């Protein structure tokens, strides 16, 4: 079963927690739709900032949006101009004041979402897929990952028949619930069609029951801005 399901969904409440953290009654669907719109807008607006994930919390007064990005300077802009514009955009979309936090990802090479997006961008630039996969694996292992697996599927290299190629190094225990496994997907839009990229990164085991382990680790590595 561990090989079939999303590794993050399987570990929710064990060593991962939700990216949308709020409760709602009758207006649940509206708030969920708002979250989707906010995330889509941020992905589109901050495509060059290396955004890994967006956490949305809704306390009693105003929503709080936390952006985990590899290049926070792109988000903030000169003298904080860009972040002010972004905050106004989010406030207009949410129809209420929004608190905005930026957290820097110090090691983007071991963030599964960023690794997948990087490989997808290389495929779009016609870099050989095996070279892109191998380079990503070597970088992740050098920076402390205990294991990594990368899947690329589609018309790789412009082949007539689509296929799936994968590369793995170290161990990636998908059945072990206490394993801290990061998972990311990305799509490369090539001239031959779309290619899917999936990345699993094993960072070690979390022995204690700690759903907020990922957030705590990110906060320790970089102060919030």
Curated annotation (Swiss-Prot):
Keywords: Ribonucleoprotein, Ribosomal protein, RNA-binding, rRNA-binding. Residues 38-106 form the KH type-2 domain. GO terms for cellular component: cytosolic small ribosomal subunit. CDD domains: KH-II_30S_S3 (cd02412). The keyword RNA-binding applies. One of its GO terms (biological process) is translation. GO terms for molecular function: mRNA binding; rRNA binding; structural constituent of ribosome. SUPFAM superfamilies: Prokaryotic type KH domain (KH-domain type II), Ribosomal protein S3 C-terminal domain. The keyword Ribonucleoprotein applies. It holds the Pfam family KH_2. InterPro entries: KH_dom, KH_dom-like_a/b, KH_dom_type_2, KH_sf_prok-type, Ribosomal_S3_C_sf, Ribosomal_uS3_bac-typ, Ribosomal_uS3_C, Ribosomal_uS3_CS. Part of the 30S ribosomal subunit. Forms a tight complex with proteins S10 and S14. Binds the lower part of the 30S subunit head. Binds mRNA in the 70S ribosome, positioning it for translation. NCBIfam families: rpsC_bact. Belongs to the universal ribosomal protein uS3 family. This is Small ribosomal subunit protein uS3. It comes from Gluconacetobacter diazotrophicus (strain ATCC 49037 / DSM 5601 / CCUG 37298 / CIP 103539 / LMG 7603 / PAl5). The lineage of its organism: Bacteria, Pseudomonadati, Pseudomonadota, Alphaproteobacteria, Acetobacterales.
